[in-house]
A protein has these predicted regions:
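Bacterial Sec-dependent N-terminal signal peptides
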Residues: 1-21
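Beta-propeller-forming repeat regions
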Residues: 17-494
Length: 494
């Protein structure tokens, strides 16, 4: 069933004084598979239109011949694909490894999956292999890899290297305290996959968080990482990259903690929230405790608890009110995982945590928001994916599931909700949409994923659809938060 494109951009059409219409450029359907990944873009075939890279999967523990997908941005046709033994849920890190002036792909997934792929053809450059069961740190690096971020070249080969977290025994039941092993933060050579440094979480706890790297105003290479999970408490840490290189994460400072039986899962973000020229840090715990940390003193600027909710969703960062301080948007889940029963959207003033906007649209999900000023009024709209069904059934119910997936834009000035797309019988639990200028024509494009809902199981896969929507919105300012972990794919707002 083809999507229904609604008139989100009809008002924008007149506001931007253009005759261009919003339209569906293409949709590509894949049977059997789904995805927990979010799209990234590179121009693979050098036709002037960026192409799409994303991970894909079947259900857990099942191998897949189409585990990483490269799609032509013009047509949606498959350019290349590669296999994996389990789910590839990471979103790609893009860096030229081979020296051919084309970006290559580093992408992660479940049970130790981490590969570097030639961006031109998908051939494996290197593949992580778990080999060390004796080393007290590396023996725990057989679990899940999360999104990597680029860091400065550490081994003087002229190529940026990667910072990445391994952890999370997915076979451990929610109440299992025995089979939970310390997460391991790693620096790896992006060219060869060699481990350059690794150390365990300072508190010895598990980790599911993609790390953050930034260089401070004072020239310090900071790394930010978290511990804990849905049912076990944890901390957010800040350390220097040198601490990790020296295997000395015990020097890390705890900058946020959650003692309520929840850890830190969603990736943190970085922006200047107090206008002092220093990069600050914002994080959200699984119990929906939001903390903003001063990047100069590493002290708390403000905290806000969203009661009776949980969160594994990261933020979008943008201009959501009239001041000049970046603000935060996310959505959190009502109820207790895995019986999450609804979703709450919140926008917070980056300066003090005061509420700009809240609503309760759709049911729970794990994707994240993106934002752009669609109507040129100086305040960014937020674009999110929501699923509408009987939210009270939770994730594990075996009751009948009638579901509709929607892509919507929220006007944070008027609180109006405008619908971009709706598809009945489809869902999107995990994937964050991408907004970009795919063909560099000066107009906003949207890349968006949906998954066929074939039975009662919200989390299973049996077919996916990827869409490119061409909008009538003329790009007048840089897209500053256009995808998962931001436009730069690194969690930093600039």
């Amino acid at each position: 069933m083809r999507c229904l494109l609604y008139l989100l951009f009809l008002i924008l059409l007149f506001a931007h004084c253009t005759t261009r219409k919003t339209s569906l450029v293409w949709e590509q359907n894949f049977p059997v598979i789904g995805s927990q990944s979010s799209p990234r873009t590179i121009d693979i075939n050098h036709d002037g239109t960026d192409d799409i890279i994303m991970g894909a999967c079947k259900n857990e523990y099942i191998s897949n011949d189409q585990a990483v997908l490269a799609l032509d941005g013009k047509s949606g046709n498959l350019l290349w694909t590669t296999d994996a033994p389990d789910q590839v849920y990471g979103s790609a890190t893009l860096v030229d490894i081979t020296g051919d002036n084309n970006k290559d792909v580093i992408i992660s997934g479940r049970w130790g999956y981490l590969r570097a792929l030639d961006g031109q053809n998908g051939k494996t450059i290197w593949n992580y292999t778990y080999t060390d069961s004796i080393d007290p740190i590396l023996k725990h690096t057989k679990f899940n890899f999360y999104n990597s971020v680029l860091i400065p070249d550490q081994n003087r080969d002229g190529i940026e290297d990667i910072l990445i977290q391994n952890g999370g025994n997915h076979r451990a039941a929610p109440d299992d305290s025995i089979h939970r092993y310390p997460g391991v933060l790693m620096v790896m050579d992006s060219k060869s996959g060699k481990i350059l440094a690794a150390d365990s979480m300072p508190d010895g706890k598990e980790s599911y968080m993609s790390p953050l790297y930034f260089k401070s105003k004072n020239g310090i290479d900071y790394i930010v990482f978290g511990s804990g999970g849905e049912t076990y408490n944890g901390h957010l840490f800040v350390a220097t990259l040198t601490d990790l290189i020296n295997k000395n994460l015990k020097n890390a400072k705890i900058v946020a903690t959650d003692a309520s039986g929840h850890g830190y899962i969603a990736p943190p973000v970085a922006a200047d929230f107090n206008n002092d020229g220093h990069t600050d840090i914002a994080c959200i715990s699984h119990s929906s405790k939001i903390t903003v940390i001063d990047g100069n003193s590493l002290s708390t600027l403000w905290e806000k608890q969203i009661p009776n909710t949980e969160s594994s969703n990261s933020f979008s960062v943008g201009k959501y009110n009239d001041d000049n301080i970046p603000d935060l948007f996310t959505f959190v889940s009502k109820g207790v995982w895995p019986q999450s029963t609804g979703s709450v959207q919140i926008a917070l003033n980056g300066k003090d945590g005061s509420l700009i906007y809240t609503d309760s649209l759709g049911c729970a999900g794990f994707s994240s928001p993106v934002s752009y000023d669609l109507n040129n009024d100086g305040i960014e709209e937020v674009i999110i994916s929501i699923n509408e069904y009987d939210c009270n059934r939770g994730y594990t119910s075996e009751s009948l599931l009638q579901i509709t997936n929607k892509l919507i834009a929220i006007n944070l000035k008027t609180h109006q909700v405008q619908q971009i797309d709706q598809t009945n019988g489809f869902k999107n639990i995990y994937s964050t949409p991408l907004i970009c200028d795919l063909d560099h024509d000066g107009y906003l494009d949207i890349i968006y994923n949906q998954y066929y809902s074939h039975n009662y199981d919200l989390l299973s896969f049996l077919g996916m659809r990827i869409k490119r929507i061409q909008s009538s919105v003329k790009i007048k300012e840089n897209i500053r938060w256009g995808g998962y972990m931001g436009t730069l794919n690194n969690g930093i707002y600039k």
